[in-house]
Curated annotation (Swiss-Prot):
One of its GO terms (molecular function) is zinc ion binding. This is Small ribosomal subunit protein uS2. Keywords: Ribonucleoprotein, Ribosomal protein. Gene3D superfamilies: Glucose-6-phosphate isomerase like protein, domain 1, Helix hairpin bin. PANTHER family: 30S RIBOSOMAL PROTEIN S2 PROKARYOTIC AND ORGANELLAR, SMALL RIBOSOMAL SUBUNIT PROTEIN US2M.
Length: 241
C-alpha cells in the first residue's frame, strides 16, 4: 500500500507551517517548535497520521467508495483535478458552492442541466440557434462545467472528502460533518482541526507538499480499487465454475 516517508516529507517542505502570529492553538500538539517566526510541524506526528489516513482511504476505495478531492486555492487547483482524474474519482477545484453536499437535490438538477447543454453543444443544437442564444448557452455551459464538472458523474453523495487546506475549505468540511461523511484533511498551523476525522498536520501551501499528498492518496485509491476489481473477478470466476 502507498505510504510516505519522513524523508519524502522533508524534501517537499511538509514541516514548514505558517508564521507564528497566525497560529491556531488547537494545533499545538502537532508543532515541534518555531524557526525565524515560522512554526515547524512535528513530522514524527504527521508521518503515522498520514499513513493511517492512506490505509483508511484504501479501505474505502476497495469497497467501491467515492472520494471527493477538494482544493479550490489557485495553487492547488490543477494538482487536485489531476490527482482525482488519475484514480477515477471526483473533485471540486474552483469554488465550493454552498450546499454542494447538503443541498444535493438542487445540485443534481444543475448537473442535469450541464449534461443537457453538453449534449446540445455536441449534437448540433447550438448551430441552429441565433448567435446570441448560442453564446449565452456556451457561457452557461462553461460556468456549470467550472463549478460542477468534477462531480457530474458522481451519481450521489461521496463516501469521503480529501481536503487540501482545512481553513480555506471550512464550508465543505462543515457540510460533510452535517451529513456524517468522513473528512481527511491537510491541516496547517493556522487551521482548526475540529471537524476533521483524519487530521494530517502539514504545509498546505507549497506545491511540492501538495503534490506529495495528492500523489500518495491517488496511488492508494487506485490500489484499493484494483483490490475491489480483483475480488469481483474472483467471484465471477467462482460462479463460472
Amino acid at each position: 500500500m502507498a505510504t510516505v516517508s519522513m524523508r519524502d516529507m522533508l524534501k517537499a517542505g511538509v514541516h514548514f507551517g505558517h508564521q507564528t502570529r497566525y497560529w491556531n492553538p488547537k494545533m499545538k500538539p502537532f508543532i515541534f517548535g518555531a524557526r525565524n517566526k515560522v512554526h515547524i510541524i512535528n513530522l514524527e506526528k504527521t508521518v503515522p497520521m498520514f499513513n493511517e489516513a492512506l490505509a483508511e482511504l484504501n479501505k474505502i476505495a476497495s469497497r467501491k467508495g467515492k472520494i471527493l478531492f477538494v482544493g479550490t486555492k489557485r495553487a492547488a487547483s490543477e494538482a487536485v483535478k489531476d490527482a482525482a482524474l488519475s484514480c477515477d474519482q471526483f473533485f471540486v477545484n474552483h469554488r465550493w458552492l454552498g450546499g454542494m453536499l447538503t443541498n444535493w437535490k438542487t445540485v443534481r438538477q444543475s448537473i442535469k442541466r450541464l449534461k443537457d447543454l453538453e449534449t446540445q453543444s455536441q449534437d448540433g443544437t447550438f448551430d441552429k440557434l441565433t448567435k446570441k442564444e448560442a453564446l449565452m448557452r456556451t457561457r452557461e455551459l462553461e460556468k456549470l462545467e467550472n463549478s460542477l464538472g468534477g462531480i457530474k458523474d458522481m451519481g450521489g453523495l461521496p463516501d469521503a472528502l480529501f481536503v487540501i487546506d482545512a481553513d480555506h475549505e471550512h464550508i465543505a468540511i462543515k457540510e460533510a460533518n452535517n451529513l456524517g461523511i468522513p473528512v481527511f484533511a491537510i491541516v496547517d498551523t493556522n487551521s482548526d482541526p475540529d471537524g476533521v476525522d483524519f487530521v494530517i498536520p502539514g504545509n498546505d501551501d507549497a506545491i511540492r507538499a501538495v503534490t506529495l499528498y495528492l500523489g500518495a492518496v491517488a496511488a492508494t485509491v487506485r490500489e484499493g480499487r484494483s483490490q475491489d476489481l480483483a475480488s469481483q473477478a474472483e467471484e465471477s470466476f467462482v460462479e463460472a465454475e
